[in-house]
Amino acid sequence: VKDNDIELIINCAAYTNVDKAEDDAEFAETLNSDAVRNLAEAIKDNDGTLIHISTDYVFGKEPYNVPCREDQKGTPTGVYGMTKLHGEQAIAASGVKSLIFRTAWLYSEYGKNFVKTMLSLTSTKPTLKVVFDQTGTPTYAQDLADTIFDIIENRRYKDNEGIYHYSNEGVCSWYDFTKMIAEIAGNDTCDIQPCHSDEFPSKVTRPSYSVLDKTKIKETFGIKVPYWTDSLKTCIKNIKANEA
């Protein structure tokens, strides 16, 4: 970075295995905080801007019951959320020009993610239990990427530093999400049943309500955010096309 006239860095790299992070805290801190600090300091020397992807996990398990705003204090309950918060704090402490995009329930056509897993399970399992007491909003990675690149291409990041929330519009539980995945895919032979989170013990307490307030990003950049079911239909259509 320092040897080249780089004006902008988009950092999508992160340690994202929430449960494994509990046993690998040092490496999670290295990727989610120390590496972010290094990027921030490097691009600052070029008088450039750092765009960084963060997460709803910085808020922890507080029972907000209203969409989380950018200025709400984070109280992470696990290593993953804490190290991501440390990354945000490292950016702020560096003084670098930056935009931080917090997102949630991210999925796409690629890699391992909830949508692809549920597509497989609902097409092969006769019954499936999915938690209904965790609420949020799915985010199609393509929508997030399009938003970020629109901001970059129009150079609107120059005068609009800060933290922004982005997810698709709407609210659902993981159970609702799974039901919609199966419906769109035509996987109607699987009996999808709602259950409590305590039926799936985990090392980390997941946020019970992680809906993100997107007022700031919509008003600042004038963007329109797609509804989560519309984006899910697009993603599943693309997944099926890739498999054909």
Per-range role (PLM):
Residues 1-31, 44:
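NAD(P)H-binding glycine-rich loop region in Rossmannoid oxidoreductase-like domains
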Residues 9-13, 50-56, 101-103:
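SDR active-site strand-loop-helix element
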Residues 19-26, 61-68, 111-112:
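Conserved catalytic-core motifs of eukaryotic protein kinase domains, centered on the activation segment
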Residues 30, 35-38, 58-101, 105-106:
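Catalytic helix-loop patch of NAD(P)-dependent Rossmann-fold dehydrogenases
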Residues 45-49:
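A short helix->loop->beta-strand "cap" motif at the edges of active sites that frequently abuts
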Residues 89-136, 141-145, 149-150:
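NAD(P)-dependent short-chain dehydrogenase/reductase
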Residues 147, 154-203, 243-244:
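Mid/C-terminal beta-alpha module of Rossmann-like enzyme folds, strongest
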Residues 228-244:
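Amphipathic terminal alpha-helices
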